[in-house]
């Protein structure tokens, strides 16, 4: 009499399932480990602070940081005052989005040189200009709000936050 083969097939399926789980666990473990290592190596927690030196963890921002130190806003504003929304949720959502985009671009060496501001970041900067300087520009704002070709503050005042770039 022959031995039934059903238990052997069940054992084989269990073994394959266990190996697949071990393999998946290893892949997830390596991915998480690499993410934690990269976050630590890039001093990721510093990006959650208001310290402007966090912006120069990445060498590509050194020129902007140096310009800010010598610029007119150094005594009054940090990077976050201009580059992230004021509300808590918007602030950290923007920091996460910027951190992801910057780390991806830095890792893949996919930065435009010199670094350029994105349209969404330009809107945040403009809104923060208005938040601090609204009383001085109220007539301009009310006029440009009706204009289909509204002008962002930094289109004319491009050197205010980071100082003059070489050659300007």
Where are these regions (language model features)?
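Short sequence/structural segments immediately N-terminal
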Residues: 2-168
């Amino acid at each position: 009499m022959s031995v039934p083969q059903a238990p052997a097939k069940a054992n084989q399926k269990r073994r394959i399932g266990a190996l697949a789980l071990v393999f998946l666990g290893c892949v997830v473990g390596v991915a998480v480990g690499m993410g934690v290592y990269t976050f630590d190596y890039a001093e990721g927690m510093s990006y959650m602070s208001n310290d402007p030196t966090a912006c120069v963890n990445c060498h590509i921002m050194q020129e902007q940081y140096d310009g800010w130190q010598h610029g007119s806003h150094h005594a009054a504003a940090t990077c976050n005052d201009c580059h992230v929304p004021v509300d808590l949720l918007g602030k950290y959502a923007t920091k996460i989005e910027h951190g992801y985009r910057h780390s991806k671009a830095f890792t893949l060496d996919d930065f435009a040189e010199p670094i350029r501001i994105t349209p969404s970041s330009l809107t945040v900067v403009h809104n923060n200009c208005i938040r601090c300087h609204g009383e001085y520009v109220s007539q301009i704002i009310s006029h440009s709000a009706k204009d289909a070709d509204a002008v962002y503050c930094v289109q004319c005042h491009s050197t205010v936050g980071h100082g003059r770039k070489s050659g300007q």
